[in-house]
């Protein structure tokens, strides 16, 4: 039997009292040769997977970044040969469902220590970060950066974020895991967008500075754009409109022992489209095309 995890999103484009929600749906595949072969919807009351990712109307009406949603990851966390499921949530706790076989799942979130309340979680990934043959967990968030959890091997996880060397950055979106430097352990690449946007601030004010033929945003809401949280945030497009860059992504090199270091964008690891080392972190659409 092959299974597929699908998401069915429903949202409103105008102000209503109904929250945006994303529900989990389990489908199984009928591999017989009958004309009815295909996917079959599994009853959540029988599977035990009843997770819903809710987002309050008042939140997404004032911050459209939250409408990008949240992710789910799958992996065998207890090494029993069955794939378990972890769901991330924006307005509520995350959920870990242990696969008990025969399409039955058990919610073991609290016992595992993985509910991550009030984290505004956006993405997740299972990966063996310490090489002990069990799957650890990464949880990306909108406001709290990347959270790292070590699998203790007994259906329990310990958070290692504070000592792991994670960069305190907002706007977390997705992540990927791979051994980019071929040293035998898994490294982490995290992507970011923004945690808030100018378009959600109805009363926002902008001051433009012109030097020669160059125009730039000098102030935002009466604050200079040299302030750390505003630096390199805005640009003037070819039509004269004001755009915003996303937060810079981060590649974390795994040093072992749940210790990571952020790779410098200009140390020669990353190359541009001319195969030359970057001179500054990329902004806009994401990273360069290659890692040497």
Label for each model-derived stretch:
Residues 1-6:
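Bacterial N-terminal signal peptides
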Residues 8-292:
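Acidic, glycine/proline-rich Ca2+-coordinating loop motifs
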């Amino acid at each position: 039997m092959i299974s597929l995890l699908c998401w069915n999103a429903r949202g409103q484009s105008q102000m209503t009292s109904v929250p945006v929600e994303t529900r989990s749906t389990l489908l199984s595949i009928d591999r017989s040769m009958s004309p009815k072969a295909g996917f079959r919807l599994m009853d959540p009351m029988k599977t035990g997977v009843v997770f819903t990712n809710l987002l309050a109307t008042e939140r997404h009406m004032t911050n459209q970044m939250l409408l990008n949603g949240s992710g789910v990851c799958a992996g065998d966390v207890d090494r029993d040969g069955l794939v378990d499921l972890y769901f991330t949530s924006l307005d509520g706790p995350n959920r870990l469902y242990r696969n008990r076989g025969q399409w039955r799942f058990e919610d073991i979130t609290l016992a595992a220590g993985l509910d991550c309340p009030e984290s505004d979680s956006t993405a997740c990934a299972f990966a063996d970060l310490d090489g002990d043959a069990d799957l650890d967990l990464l949880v990306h968030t909108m406001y709290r950066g990347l959270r790292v959890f070590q699998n203790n091997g007994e259906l329990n996880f310990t958070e290692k974020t504070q000592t792991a060397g994670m960069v305190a950055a907002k706007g977390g979106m997705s992540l990927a895991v791979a051994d980019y430097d071929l040293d035998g352990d898994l490294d982490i690449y995290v992507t970011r967008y923004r945690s808030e946007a100018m378009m959600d601030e109805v009363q926002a004010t902008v001051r433009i500075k012109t030097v020669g033929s160059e125009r730039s945003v000098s102030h935002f809401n009466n604050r200079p754009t040299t302030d750390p949280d505003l630096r390199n945030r805005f640009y003037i497009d070819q039509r004269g409109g004001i755009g915003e860059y996303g937060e810079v992504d981060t590649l974390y090199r795994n040093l072992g022992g749940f210790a990571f270091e952020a790779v410098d964008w200009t140390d020669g690891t990353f190359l541009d489209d001319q195969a030359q080392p970057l001179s500054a972190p990329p902004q806009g659409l994401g990273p360069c095309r290659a890692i040497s």
